[in-house]
Amino acid sequence: MITGKQQFIYVTFQEEGIHRYPAAAHDPKLKTGEWNDVSFLGVEHRHIFHFRVELEVMHDDRDVEFIQFKRELQNLYRNNMMTLDHKSCEMISDELARYINEKYPEREIRIQVAEDGENGSYTVYRPSVALDEWIEIEEGA
């Protein structure tokens, strides 16, 4: 017996970006000189960032048309409204979620951002928490 449902659409796309993790160049936890050394992340390096964005929809008849949604998100980067440079996957996700939340309010948003389709972040943004408040809580923790 089904007692309720929550529906999502999802889109995937890729964008090229250059970024760096400045702390990696000098933080002893990152610049270890051992097998786990990641100090190379402190210099600019290129990635193809892979996105998977899920958006809650309110009905099953193209509440949000996913091809249009995908193009809308791609254009944010292609028209330089958003940039990937020098941001972590989590930062990229938060910035994208702010835009989506403003355009499509009161919907759950799920975003995956991966470097080269290999490693990345996955974040769920729930409409019951104001996005800016949630991000401030995380940054202040």
Which functions belong to the PLM regions below?
Residues 1-141:
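Charge-rich, low-complexity N-terminal segments
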